[in-house]
């Protein structure tokens, strides 16, 4: 530990103590808030089922930066490199297409055994796992419908895929001792004017009810459902809208997933958290960065990321909100993308934990909005960076931008050799 870092830390403790904040307690709380990293940043959402297949479902990964993972071994190695550079607790979020098998496996036939390597790896790296059925990039999703498909046989295929995915998710939770949050997102929708908007939603409702009919221990598995405003090729109508899934999660008491890029550009999910929490037992957050649309850019330490973190902390939602990331940028080093986005989410959580919320709440309750605004702005200048650097130091991870040197070395020695 450098003298400079120690000096900055001591000064920071004093500055925060002056506004009633115990920085040690803030760091202890930060150590209880895992962030679920998404595996698909590492290979541009290709997966191992059909790595050369096209990405469909109205989503896009743009760019062609060299060195993307081509198999599970490479993906896990890249993840390990990123994990070493991110302080504090982490989880890993898997999609069904990241299964491992020597023979082709139909999606409605996936089993826990196809993910046993991921479980053993998670145990070795002390990670929890989360899961997602993959309802896109498949011949039976090519016409834009899955769980709401008008063809009963195709619809049943996707129902069976989601049911099989829930068994995999429960296996994760049972093996790792921490519940797996399994999120259902489907691309179902229409490109142009839609006459019958009701029937697909009726089919989706019935399909979801069948999907979640098998009961699992909530200590092992948690169901979540995710809405979206539109996707490429589904600009005019999305079956799984916000209103649909808010109603579903409320009536069935599942978790609701809020994705930062799945709403109108003028909407923010930070404002939706407190409203949803009045009706649903849990929230899953997909923290992302939409640029004009659901572009899934790397998460920044920007106003919305900070607002999301602040909502969690201010309302003490630590046990009810699950924090996940969802971005995929193929134009930059993929390991660096993980590190940048995840460290930024954790920085936002730390800054929220260092806020004198009780004092601000009292000012708000008394109607002193002048002081509220003044203190909100002044606390941005408090030395939270020194607290962050101490946190990194205690977790044996680089401070500042020193982590980039490690990524560059890994790129030169490993990534550059991938064809």
UniProtKB/Swiss-Prot annotation:
A Pfam entry, by short name: RhaA
GO CC list: cytoplasm
Cellular compartment(s): Cytoplasm
Reaction(s) the record says it catalyses: L-rhamnopyranose = L-rhamnulose
Cofactor list: Mn(2+)
Broad class of the protein's primary localization: cytoplasm
GO molecular function terms noted in the UniProt entry: L-rhamnose isomerase activity; manganese ion binding
One GO term of the biological process aspect: rhamnose catabolic process
Superkingdom per UniProt: Bacteria
EC number from the UniProt entry: 5.3.1.14
SUPFAM superfamilies recorded: Xylose isomerase-like
Biological or metabolic pathway of the protein: Carbohydrate degradation; L-rhamnose degradation; glycerone phosphate from L-rhamnose: step 1/3
Positions annotated to bind Mn(2+): 262, 294, 296
Cofactor note: Binds 1 Mn(2+) ion per subunit.
Keywords from the UniProt entry: Cytoplasm, Isomerase, Manganese, Metal-binding, Rhamnose metabolism
PANTHER family, sorted: L-RHAMNOSE ISOMERASE
Subunit structure of this chain's protein: Homotetramer.
The protein's role, per its UniProt record: Catalyzes the interconversion of L-rhamnose and L-rhamnulose.
Family: Belongs to the rhamnose isomerase family.
UniProt cross-references to HAMAP family, sorted A to Z: RhaA
Protein name, UniProt field: L-rhamnose isomerase
Source organism per UniProt: Salmonella agona (strain SL483)
Gene name, Swiss-Prot/TrEMBL: rhaA
């Amino acid at each position: 530990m450098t003298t400079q870092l120690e000096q900055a830390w001591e000064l920071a403790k004093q500055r925060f103590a002056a506004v009633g904040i115990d920085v040690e307690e803030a760091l202890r709380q930060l150590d209880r808030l895992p962030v679920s990293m998404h595996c698909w940043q590492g290979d541009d959402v290709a997966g191992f089922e059909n790595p050369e297949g096209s990405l469909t479902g109205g989503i896009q990964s743009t760019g062609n930066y060299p060195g993307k993972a081509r198999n599970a071994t490479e993906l896990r190695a890249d993840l390990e490199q990123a994990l070493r550079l991110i302080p504090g607790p982490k989880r890993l979020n898997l999609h069904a297409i990241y299964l491992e098998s020597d023979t082709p496996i139909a999606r409605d036939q996936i089993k826990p055994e196809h993910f046993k390597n991921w479980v053993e790896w998670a145990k070795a790296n002390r990670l929890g796992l989360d899961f997602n059925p993959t309802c896109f990039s498949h011949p039976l999703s090519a016409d834009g419908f899955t769980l709401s498909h008008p063809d009963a046989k195709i619809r049943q295929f996707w129902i069976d895929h989601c049911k099989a995915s829930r068994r995999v998710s429960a296996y994760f939770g049972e093996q790792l001792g921490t519940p797996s949050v399994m999120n259902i997102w489907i691309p179902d929708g229409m490109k142009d004017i839609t006459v019958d908007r009701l029937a697909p939603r009726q089919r989706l409702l019935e399909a979801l009810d069948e999907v979640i009919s098998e009961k699992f221990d909530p200590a092992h598995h948690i169901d979540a459902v995710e809405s979206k405003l539109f996707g490429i090729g589904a600009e005019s109508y999305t079956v799984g809208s916000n209103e649909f899934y808010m109603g579903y999660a409320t009536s069935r008491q599942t978790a609701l997933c809020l994705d930062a890029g799945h709403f109108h550009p003028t909407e923010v999910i930070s404002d939706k958290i407190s409203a949803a929490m009045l009706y649903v037992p849990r929230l899953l957050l997909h923290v992302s960065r939409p640029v004009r649309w659901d572009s899934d850019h790397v998460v920044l330490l920007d106003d919305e990321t900070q607002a999301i973190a602040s909502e969690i902390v201010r309302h003490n939602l630590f046990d009810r909100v699950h924090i996940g990331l969802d971005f995929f940028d193929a134009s930059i080093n993929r390991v660096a993308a993980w590190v940048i986005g995840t460290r930024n989410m954790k920085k936002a959580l730390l800054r929220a934990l260092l806020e004198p919320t009780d004092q601000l709440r009292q000012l708000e309750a008394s109607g002193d909005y002048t002081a509220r605004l003044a203190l909100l702005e002044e606390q941005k200048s408090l030395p939270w960076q020194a607290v962050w650097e101490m946190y990194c130091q205690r977790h044996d991870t680089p401070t500042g931008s020193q982590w980039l040197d490690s990524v560059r070395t890994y790129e030169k020695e490993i990534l550059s050799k991938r064809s």
